[in-house]
Amino acid sequence: MNNVNLQIYSFGFDCGLSFLDKIRKAGELGYAGVELVRDYEGIPAQDVVNALKEAGIPAVSAHVGLDFIEQDLPYLAELGVKYVACPMAAFNTAEEAKELAADLNRLGKLAKEYGITIGYHNHTGEFYVDQGKYLLDWVM
């Protein structure tokens, strides 16, 4: 599984493993790295770094809600995360999509200062049409 990373979310929330144990288990299973979910709240960054070292894998990316990205950037940089994906946002119109794009652009500039790239994880709602374009096109 040399080049395959695991999204920690894949373990689910009721698997009986703590957040740190999920990281260790991913390494034990042979994954090359992990994508974090925001279950790290309240866990000191050094504890996560230690779990990653024990597992022998990096935290390549993280899924972080739009409202938490800015505050989490310093923490994620400490962990060595290079990519942050906003997993979804509520928008139903072209205007709301443009507002999301502005937010993501602002966060992208801030994230760059930490060596992190921001992305957006789309779902089906982004393919609704407003003003003749898919909502996702307005975000892009």
What are these regions (language model features)?
Residues 17, 60-140:
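Active-site acidic/histidine proton-transfer and metal-coordination neighborhood
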Residues 1-83:
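N-terminal pre-domain/capping segments
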